[in-house]
UniProtKB/Swiss-Prot annotation:
SUPFAM superfamilies registered for this protein in UniProt: Ribosomal protein L1
BP terms from Gene Ontology: regulation of translation; translation
Species classification: Bacteria, Pseudomonadati, Pseudomonadota, Gammaproteobacteria, Alteromonadales
Function: Binds directly to 23S rRNA. The L1 stalk is quite mobile in the ribosome, and is involved in E site tRNA release. Protein L1 is also a translational repressor protein, it controls the translation of the L11 operon by binding to its mRNA.
One cellular-component annotation, GO: cytosolic large ribosomal subunit
Disulfide bond residue pairs: none
InterPro entries with a match to the protein in the record: Ribosom_uL1_bac-type, Ribosomal_uL1, Ribosomal_uL1-like, Ribosomal_uL1/biogenesis, Ribosomal_uL1_3-a/b-sand, Ribosomal_uL1_CS
Homology family: Belongs to the universal ribosomal protein uL1 family.
Quaternary organization: Part of the 50S ribosomal subunit.
UniProt protein name: Large ribosomal subunit protein uL1
Gene3D superfamilies, per the entry: 3.30.190.20, 3.40.50.790
Gene name of the encoded protein: rplA
Keyword tRNA-binding listed: yes
One example GO MF annotation: tRNA binding
Keywords linked to the UniProt accession: Repressor, Ribonucleoprotein, Ribosomal protein, RNA-binding, rRNA-binding, Translation regulation, tRNA-binding
Amino acid sequence: MAKLTKRARLVRDKVEATKEYDFNEAVALLKELATAKFAESVDVAVNLGIDARKSDQNVRGATVLPNGTGKEVRVAVFTQGANAEAAKEAGADIVGMEDLAEQVKKGEMNFDVVVASPDAMRVVGMLGQILGPRGLMPNPKTGTVTPDVATAVKNAKAGQVRYRNDKNGIIHASIGKIAFESNQIEENLAALIEAVKKAKPSSAKGVYIKKISLSTTMGAGITIDQASLTAAS
């Protein structure tokens, strides 16, 4: 049997796998257990009461976190003309059309988010096999295919998170850094949960949000008592 690392032993001793923790207690535990030498992200996993095999029950969208993600986001925009100038003024890192597509084909993708105006999708559409697997393909549901590219750029820079459930009906997202204050993490989580609730498929039956777990980049998941979320704010 492999030896447990010092951190793994600490997690085992501190975190009860079956317990639902008060939100503030959970964040305090995460901070105590965050021993990595880099600024760890705070990640959330939201288990949904959906049948992920049915396309009409899949949940997808985007929301801007009130306190940002703590990450510097690089944004590439596929557009032209006046929209190109608007994107640059809004803070886009790279703006182009066919020239940007050529960079992508060469594997030069020094960006975290891709935005496209509708007229640019003829170019972006040919990059689906490259951008899709990396989670970078623009989509109207996440606000990244839009005629208002300037707002999309500003949202991305302000800490917008894009979310979608995986094949097990779980949404994974980063909602800040471990250095954030507890109330900042709670406000970000509340914004994400509110957006996910609004995106509830009409065909989903029963309990919609079944479980919420928080973890850090290198840490174990801690299940949150949902009743404590409103009490924490």
